[in-house]
Structures are given as C-alpha cells and as structure tokens.
Amino acid sequence: MKATADGIAAAQRPDGGIPWEPGGHLDPWNHLEAAMGLDVAGLGAEAEAAYDWLVRNQRPDGSWAARYRDGGIDLSTMDTNFTAYVAVGTRHHFLVTGDRTWLDRMWPVVDRAIGAVLRRQQPSGAISWRDDPGIRLVAGCSSIHHALTQALALASAMGLHRPQWWDAARRLRAALLGEPRLFAAKPHAMDWYYPILGSVVTGADATARLAAGWDRFVEPGLGVRCVHHEPWVTGGETAELALTLAARG
C-alpha cells in the first residue's frame, strides 16, 4: 500500500492535482479516488492539497470540468458522477481526520456540487451523464446515489437538513431498480457491481445479483474482466469488486 501511495504522491502536481499518470490528464473522480488513497496511507497533507485543488477549480455553477490537462480545462462538459463524488471524498477525509474546521470549509463546495448534479435529474428520477439528456448510466447513477447518501451524512454533521436530497436519492434509486430501459446497456463489470457498491441494491437482492454475474465477469485466480466479452482483467474493477464484497459482508 505504501508503494502505491508513494506513486500517487509522486504523480501529484505542485498545485495539488493528481493526474492519471505523471504528465497526463486529470479527471475529478479519479483525482478524488487518489486523494482517498493518500489518506488511507497516512499522507494527509498530500490529500488536503488534492482537496484544495478542487476548491480552487470548482466552477460558479458548482461543477468541475470532465477533464483537465497541464493545469487547464481539456474537456469542459460536466460529468455528473465526477462532480457528485466530492461528497464521498469529503466524508472520507472528515471520518479519517475529524477536522471540523476543514469540513466547514469544504461544506459549501459539496453543497454547490450536489446542487449542480441535481439540476440534471429528470422527471423519471434518473440523472443524465453529461450534456445529452438521453444518456444515463447505471454505474454513474449508482455512484451518484452513493454520493447523495454521503452528502446527507455531511449535512447531518453540519446540523443541516436537506430533504430535497433525500427525495432525489429515493427517486434515483427507484429509477435504477424499476426502469432499466432508461439506462444505456453496456457490457462492463461496473454495471454489475456498482448498484451494490452504491447501496442501490441491498440485502438478498445484492447477493443474488453478485451470484448472477460472477461467472460472467470473474476470471478465477486473476480478478475481474472489465467487459464480459474480452479477456482483460483490470486492477480497478477487481479492487472495486473487493470493496463491493466487503460492503455486502
């Protein structure tokens, strides 16, 4: 774990941004995943520098661009899943540190981000991925559902109530569970496990879903295939399935 965290820290830019690889592009979701990894490894100062980057780069509407390169915007559209994920990272850092002063600073950032995402929620309850309202993703919306639960926990820690967020999460979950036709059909493993990881599918239904997709996506002795019809086993999907199994118990 230390070697992985040291690799992340080595890739981190002086402004706090964490690209995919040294000199590569940055997206807010992977940036946040990396920041959480830094916290787990005890590199709290580096993690806070990553959150400072988010504070400085949040746009007036509460969103971030989908991709950055060389310190500037490379793809300006908002990815709703990427923007919502700041709630997950913020809750994680607060649980690790207990730093209320830091949370007071981050709360307005989270509040604006969730507002930006929920402006894309449709009457069906689903949330569009980017600019095209017709594209809605199972994994992305499941991740947003997770982010909403964490945003609500942060609101509670702040002594605030956001009933509209509860309603948004309820409607989003109902769409994911009851209206599969709304979402793009994809062959990716993440569409199999993310509804469980995002607490959309729970209990016996989660166990059944894992069992139904296991042979389709899991390569024994190796890990998880990124897509069911190709032989590649990927570290990211394997790690996420491990988290899903841990969350399921």
Predicted regions: what is each one?
Residues 11, 20, 24-32, 36, ...:
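N-terminal beta1-alpha1-beta2 module of alpha/beta enzyme domains
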Residues 134-179:
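Loop-centered beta-sheet repeat module
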Residues 27, 31, 79, 83-86, ...:
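Residues that mark the junctions of alpha-helical repeat units in TPR/alpha-solenoid scaffolds
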Residues 76, 103, 162:
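Flexible, glycine- and charge-enriched loops at secondary-structure boundaries
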Residues 1-25, 48-83, 107, 112-133, ...:
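Extended glycan-interaction surfaces of carbohydrate-active proteins
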Residues 32-46, 85-102, 143-160, 193-204, ...:
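Well-ordered alpha-helical scaffold segments within catalytic/enzyme domains
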